[in-house]
Amino acid sequence: MSGWDSYRVVYGAELRAAAHEFEDHGWPVVERDATTLLLVTGTVLDILEVPASFGRQVCAHLRDAGEVVPVGAAPTGEWWFPMSMGSTLPAELRDTADVRLHTAGEMVLAPPSAVPDGWVHWRVAPALSSYHVPSADLLLHSAVDVARWRADHALRPGAQRPAGAMAVGMRS
């Protein structure tokens, strides 16, 4: 067996293990192909997708509030947050570039999917929150706080930030 073939066997096993882990915790997942898992939204969870810089600020805001929530990331710079289903995107977030709410049967790449630019991975693994999906209210409230701070800060460069709304340095 060549090195590439053995890698594909190991990766396939890792992908299947991840799919079983999602299923064991009630997260709806489908395997698109040999390198890609998709989380299905709208039955158990919805997903808020944001740019990485916005996601870092949301994570800092949640962390300052003592909340640990799962966070996925794509190599193209999107971060996404699973959350309880049934909400709509608040007006403050609809006006924010590149913020998207995935609902009603949409599918989102799930770790450890391979894409041309790299790997979809966890920034905060769901096991750290026992696969608990945070409430949409908690997550959307934090995202709105960050969006408001960013809008205010753009108008007033010396604006006081809400707790955790801006990460110092690069956090990964």
Predicted segment positions?
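Conserved catalytic-core surface of thiol
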Residues: 99-143, 147
